[in-house]
């Protein structure tokens, strides 16, 4: 689609304030930032406009050969959204095959760890997406898109994967529904996630190594899109995050919003209210959007996303797109992007393969610009420390992606009033990362 457009100048930042619970309070936002593409004011996060945009972000920057497939996909998605039979089938599979709903777990020892000397501190809960079949949140979307592909008559499925969890989830559902499965994965990611590569192949998927670029998630996504362009008539692309061209950001979010809906219901059951703070890691941003979306209109609920700072955001080894990026186009969508002055993509770095991506979902960019969500970053070492800390305190080995969110508790908890309820999305389990962590941690 050509080089990314230059980053806009003169963007006003939203003023912020905090109440005693550390929650965001309303402040002025740039009118341009909160206007949808059709000129209507956006009351937070809703559906994108007719062009697939959230404010200035999103859209369809794709070859003409893909436009029909995207239009067909959007039409099918909207039709199935009101199809009771489809919803019943999906709900049944999520319950009996995936194992939903996932628990909202009170992390008692982690809560105790962050208490102050006077015994006060926040209460920490984990949304246990790591307990889903295949070990992460990714299967929520994979199951739904596989069902959608069947309705479209597509028997060949392709997907990209970084950490391997989306690849495993896609391979799993393809076996469940008898579909052909091809997974694109960066050669570097295949080395650090060898266990997941074996799992995908055990499940009958063809895993194609991508050696171009840095041989990571960005390059795997590019190859998957090339495949789709070539085989669009027979193939459905199960994109694994809230990125890519419209309708994928909206559609993947809708398939993951079960995370936030369950969290709201479980919070009401457990303490008769809502969470005060929601925390999730952000690469492309699907697990965070799945948790956040339900609460975007609840202005008293604070939304915090954590990106990968790698070796530090002031080095050239990080993946902190929302912290350091500029607006550009990647993989069919306009969003914040790590790029140089010439609009060329800067290669990201993270110890976590799932966060090692130079872009981010357009809705996250929109939430950042309107000031509804806040984004920070966590270094490799901080994530490794949290990986070990949570394993030792709670007997839960989190994914390195999740560990970025858990690491932020070190910074967040001292700022919160007593009794503030924090929900961290435990987006995946860390079995896949034990080999990587063992190179850095002394246990």
UniProtKB/Swiss-Prot annotation:
Keywords, in A-Z order: Amino-acid biosynthesis, Aromatic amino acid biosynthesis, Chloroplast, Lyase, Plastid, Pyridoxal phosphate, Transit peptide, Tryptophan biosynthesis
Cellular location(s): Plastid, Chloroplast
Pathway the protein acts in: Amino-acid biosynthesis; L-tryptophan biosynthesis; L-tryptophan from chorismate: step 5/5
Residue range of the transit peptide in the UniProt record, numbered on this chain: 1-45
Annotated segments matching region Disordered: 1-32
Co-factor requirement: pyridoxal 5'-phosphate
Annotated GO MF terms: tryptophan synthase activity
EC class of the enzyme, as a word: lyase
GO cellular component: chloroplast; cytoplasm
SUPFAM superfamilies: Tryptophan synthase beta subunit-like PLP-dependent enzymes
Residues modified to N6-(pyridoxal phosphate)lysine: 138
BP term (GO), one: L-tryptophan biosynthetic process
InterPro entries: Trp_synth_b_CS, Trp_synth_beta, Trp_synth_beta/beta-like, TrpB-like_PALP, TrpB-like_PALP_sf
UniProt feature, compositional bias: Low complexity: 18-32
The keyword Lyase belongs to this UniProt entry's keyword annotation: yes
Enzyme Commission no: 4.2.1.20
Catalytic reaction(s) noted: (1S,2R)-1-C-(indol-3-yl)glycerol 3-phosphate + L-serine = D-glyceraldehyde 3-phosphate + L-tryptophan + H2O
Quaternary structure note: Tetramer of two alpha and two beta chains.
PANTHER family tied to this protein: TRYPTOPHAN SYNTHASE, TRYPTOPHAN SYNTHASE-RELATED
Main function: The beta subunit is responsible for the synthesis of L-tryptophan from indole and L-serine.
Similarity comment: Belongs to the TrpB family.
Protein's name according to its UniProt entry: Tryptophan synthase beta chain 2, chloroplastic
Organism in which the protein naturally occurs: Zea mays (Maize)
């Amino acid at each position: 689609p050509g080089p990314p457009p230059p980053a806009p100048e003169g963007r006003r930042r939203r003023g912020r304030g905090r109440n005693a619970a550390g929650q965001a309070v309303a402040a002025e936002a740039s009118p341009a930032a909160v206007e949808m593409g059709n000129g209507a004011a956006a009351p937070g996060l809703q559906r994108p406009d007719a062009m697939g945009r959230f404010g200035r972000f999103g859209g369809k920057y794709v070859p003409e050969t893909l436009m029909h497939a995207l239009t067909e996909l959007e039409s099918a998605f909207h039709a199935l959204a009101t199809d009771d039979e489809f919803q019943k089938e999906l709900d049944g599979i999520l319950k009996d095959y995936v194992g939903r709903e996932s628990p909202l777990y009170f992390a008692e020892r982690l809560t105790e760890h962050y208490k102050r000397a006077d015994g006060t501190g926040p209460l920490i809960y984990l949304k246990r997406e790591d307990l889903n079949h295949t070990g992460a949140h990714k299967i929520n979307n994979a199951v739904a898109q596989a069902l959608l592909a069947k309705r479209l008559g597509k028997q060949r499925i392709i997907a990209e994967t970084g950490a391997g969890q989306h690849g495993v989830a896609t391979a799993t559902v393809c076996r469940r529904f008898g579909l052909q499965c091809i997974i694109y994965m960066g050669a570097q990611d295949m080395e650090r996630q060898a266990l997941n590569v074996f799992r995908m192949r055990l499940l009958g998927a063809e895993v194609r190594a991508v050696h171009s670029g840095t041989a990571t998630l960005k390059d795997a996504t590019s190859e998957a899109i090339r495949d789709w362009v070539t085989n669009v008539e027979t193939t459905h692309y199960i994109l694994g995050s809230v990125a890519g061209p419209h309708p994928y950001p909206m559609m993947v979010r809708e398939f993951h919003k079960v995370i936030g809906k369950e969290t709201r219901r479980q919070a009401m059951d457990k303490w008769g209210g809502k969470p005060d703070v929601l925390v999730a890691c952000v690469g492309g941003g699907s697990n965070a959007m799945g948790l956040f979306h339900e609460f975007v209109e609840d202005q008293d609920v604070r939304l915090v996303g954590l990106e990968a700072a790698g070796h530090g955001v002031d080095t050239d080894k990080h993946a902190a797109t929302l912290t350091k990026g500029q607006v550009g186009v990647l993989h069919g969508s306009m969003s914040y992007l790590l790029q140089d002055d010439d609009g060329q993509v800067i290669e990201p770095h993270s110890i976590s393969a799932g966060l090692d991506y130079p872009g981010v979902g357009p809705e996250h960019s929109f939430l950042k610009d309107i000031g509804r969500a806040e984004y920070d970053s966590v270094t490799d070492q901080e994530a490794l420390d949290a990986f070990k800390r949570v394993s030792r305190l709670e007997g839960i080995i989190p994914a390195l992606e999740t560990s970025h969110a858990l690491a932020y508790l070190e910074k967040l908890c001292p700022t919160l009033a007593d009794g503030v309820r924090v929900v961290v999305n435990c987006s995946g389990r860390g079995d896949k990362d034990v080999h990587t962590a063992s190179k850095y941690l002394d246990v």
